[in-house]
């Protein structure tokens, strides 16, 4: 058994990822000063027993070891004095844009100025999308992410999660289709792209946004996904243009549908429709428990109600919103009203890093600034970064469940170098300062990344 406590200061480029190793007959016991299962009470001096890539036992260290000894199971223990919790779920990212960090390193005045900077790099730079997506996947593992919602725009980037052994969903992004082009060849094109994507993990469809697709593809894509038993993921409420008009509304959504002037969200807006993008996609049947949305910044109380009614989760990406120059998402309202929440980093083209805990810390500050004063904030935000993300990706139940530490679940975990005091105070410290303090990432029970200064703590003798 080993222990230590030192702060990691590794840079993004130090992500040396280990290959998955074959499962052995020896049970691995991972113990820590505090274990946070998410689906059960946190345990001081806790432990997780792992066998065959799955969790066997969760509880106090003494109980877990006693249970293994009583069963005559050989085991090896790895102990760190910090925190052990489920692997993080990055519920919205674009790993292929890892090479566009120069765009995300700046600040912008709104969506148009950011899009101009993005297009200037995307259109005039030769990228190896496969290599960049793989690098993004490695960085994700370094930051404790074990599952991701990866939006794929170029087919070369489609295999990043598959190749690196990450869980989650790779979503094929669909954008720029007019009604006419879609009718001629859209469904066949999308189906062919989906058929070419490797599995596992799961694949899904990402209709980019209400403003980047005409109405017919937005109407058809949910049906196409559901016939194939695929999940959906859409950017929604990210730009000012998607917000409901507070004044000057001249036409209601139902009126415009009946008039036949419903070729696209943009066209209907130009004809005086003051409805929100959320109302628009809800009318088209996009939302549902098999769909989650990214950003959700410009959402009225009615928009948030619609998301709750459809059991649709929101992946909040506050650092991306800040870089682009958008408002902060209504975090306090989401929490008070009971919306399903997850956390995403977005891509390095609009965010400083792929560390989900950076976004968690910012969400904490935003919620407090917006008046959320309850003492459960830190605990709830840890939930959004783990089980909340699993719910958003459809991975919270069943044999492949993630985002939780419980018997039978996939053994995806992350260690943090955070000093352990009381349970409440340690969780507060983890949420507010846990970014870049990851020690080790375990996927399917296999050690995939470890801070080199802690590497010997993950070796041990069989007992």
Residue ranges and their predicted role:
Residues 2-29, 35-85:
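Histidine-rich, glycine-flanked metal-binding segment
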Residues 73-75, 156-164, 186-313, 325-341:
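Histidine/acidic residue-rich metal-binding segments in metalloenzymes
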Residues 83-84, 99-164, 187-198:
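Alpha-helical scaffold segments that flank or form the walls of functional sites
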Residues 94, 153-154, 173-177, 208-210, ...:
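Active-site beta-loop-alpha junctions enriched in small/polar residues
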Residues 99-131, 169-175, 240-288, 363-370:
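Active-site gating loops and adjacent loop-to-helix segments of metal-dependent hydrolytic enzymes
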Residues 283-286, 329-420:
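His/Asp/Glu-enriched, well-ordered alpha-helical/loop segment
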Residues 407-463:
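C-terminal cap of metal-dependent C-N hydrolases
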């Amino acid at each position: 058994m080993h222990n230590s406590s030192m702060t990691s200061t590794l840079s993004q480029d130090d992500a040396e990822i280990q290959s998955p190793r074959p499962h052995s007959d020896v049970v691995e016991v991972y113990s820590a000063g505090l274990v946070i299962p998410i689906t059960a009470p946190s345990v001081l001096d806790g432990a997780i027993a792992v066998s065959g890539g799955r969790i066997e036992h969760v509880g106090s260290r003494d109980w877990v070891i006693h249970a293994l000894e009583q069963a005559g199971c050989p085991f090896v223990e790895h102990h760190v004095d910090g925190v052990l919790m489920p692997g993080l779920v990055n519920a919205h990212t674009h790993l292929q844009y890892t090479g566009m960090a120069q765009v995300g390193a700046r600040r912008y005045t709104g969506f148009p100025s950011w899009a101009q900077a993005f297009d200037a790099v995307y259109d005039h730079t030769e990228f190896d999308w496969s290599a960049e997506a793989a690098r993004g996947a490695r960085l994700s593992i370094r930051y404790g992410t074990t599952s991701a919602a990866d939006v794929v725009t170029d087919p070369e980037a489609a295999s990043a999660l598959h190749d690196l052994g990450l869980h989650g969903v790779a979503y094929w992004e669909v954008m720029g289709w007019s009604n006419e082009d879609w009718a001629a060849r859209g469904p066949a094109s999308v189906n062919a792209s989906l058929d070419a994507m490797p599995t596992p993990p799961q694949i899904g469809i990402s209709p980019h946004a209400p403003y980047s697709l005409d109405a017919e593809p937005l109407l058809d894509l949910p049906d196409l996904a559901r016939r194939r038993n695929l999940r959906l993921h859409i950017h929604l409420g990210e730009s000012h243009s998607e917000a409901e008009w507070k004044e000057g509304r001249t036409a209601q959504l139902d009126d415009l549908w009946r008039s036949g002037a419903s070729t696209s969200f943009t066209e209907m807006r130009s004809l005086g429709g003051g409805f929100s993008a959320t109302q628009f996609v809800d009318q088209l049947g996009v939302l549902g428990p098999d769909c989650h949305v990214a950003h959700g910044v410009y959402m009225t109380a009615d928009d948030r109600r619609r998301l709750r009614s459809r059991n649709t989760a929101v992946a909040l990406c506050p650092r991306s919103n800040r870089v682009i120059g958008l408002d902060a998402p209504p975090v306090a309202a989401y929490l008070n009203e009971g919306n399903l929440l997850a956390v995403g980093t977005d891509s390095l083209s609009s965010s400083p890093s792929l560390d989900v805990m950076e976004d968690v810390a910012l969400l904490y500050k935003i919620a407090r600034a917006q008046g959320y004063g309850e003492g459960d904030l830190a605990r709830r935000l840890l939930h959004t970064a783990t089980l909340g993300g699993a719910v958003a990706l459809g991975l919270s139940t069943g044999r492949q469940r993630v985002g939780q530490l419980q018997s039978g679940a996939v053994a995806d975990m992350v260690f943090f170098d955070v000093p352990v005091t009381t349970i409440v105070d340690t969780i507060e410290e983890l949420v507010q300062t846990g970014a870049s303090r990851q020690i080790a990432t375990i996927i399917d029970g296999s050690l995939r990344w470890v801070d080199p200064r802690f590497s010997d703590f993950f070796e041990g003798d069989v007992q």
